[in-house]
Amino acid sequence: WTYPEDSAYALKDPFRRAAEILHYYSDLLGPFPYGSLAHVESSTRFGGMENSTAIFYDEKRYRQQNLGEPVVAHETAHQWFGDAVTERDWHHLWLSEGFATYLAALWQAHADGDSAFRAGMRQMADQVFESKEVGQPILDTTATDLVGLLNSNNYQKGAWVLHQLRGVVGDSAFFSGLRRYYSTFRDSTALSADFARIMSEAAGRDLDWYFRQALTQPGYPMLDLKWAHKGKKLTVDISQTQPAEWGEFQIPSLILLVDDIPVRLHVDGRQTRQVVEGIRRKPKRIEVDPNGWWLLKATVGSDR
């Protein structure tokens, strides 16, 4: 539903694939929870407002022609998470906003390819790195300004919490868990602990360690890697250099690309040393997390 003067723009750009987005989420998450969905141009003060069955979009964005499909994908995802499944407490807002942000990124991967998805995730990482909330945890129970919770922690970092979780448990368990979470709490409310429990069940292992660090610790891992090569052994020393008040992070499966050889490391604690056998030549290049599964910053030192 648009004002007559804005209909041409709406049909050619932001809403061109609106029906495809709806079908994609239905296949991915479970049945659309309502009988219909309308996209409505309105005078809302928000860029998009995810009212159940009737999403409102700011009329000014039509006039400026900067609404964009990512906003439509984000607000449509809220029909599942935010509307049908709602966080029980405002401090768990990431259960709405982080989910919608990541689902919009998944739509981008589906529609536009993996390179577009990776670029979007890198952009979100930069937003987290540069945000003023970086020193606060996602579950900030001290927050009293509820509107202030509409920040990068609950949107972009929340999306990264889901992306990292997917990397930890694998696609099968991750998407199975998402569908189970939706079907279990549809037309109801949930807390982060509910989601953590269902994902642990889907993965078949305890994920409390992950949700504890992802949701209750501020910041992100900052890694300094130093390496030495001798014979056929590569020794890698990893230091976590983030501020002490952020705590230490566990990264159970950190991939290093040593030239063209993927090496899997386990990072746990402020200092980690691992010796990798079978590296015959002195590396020319070492890349940390080449597939972009972790929200982190890393530096790699030269051979000692």
Regions found by a protein language model. Give the residues of each.
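Short acidic/polar inter-strand loop motif in beta-rich domains
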Residues: 263, 290-303
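Short, gly/Ser/Thr-rich active-site loops of penicillin-recognizing serine hydrolases
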Residues: 283, 303-304
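Hydrophobic alpha-helical and helix-loop surface patches within well-folded domains
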Residues: 1-244
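Beta-strand-rich binding/interaction modules
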Residues: 207-208, 221-223, 227-290
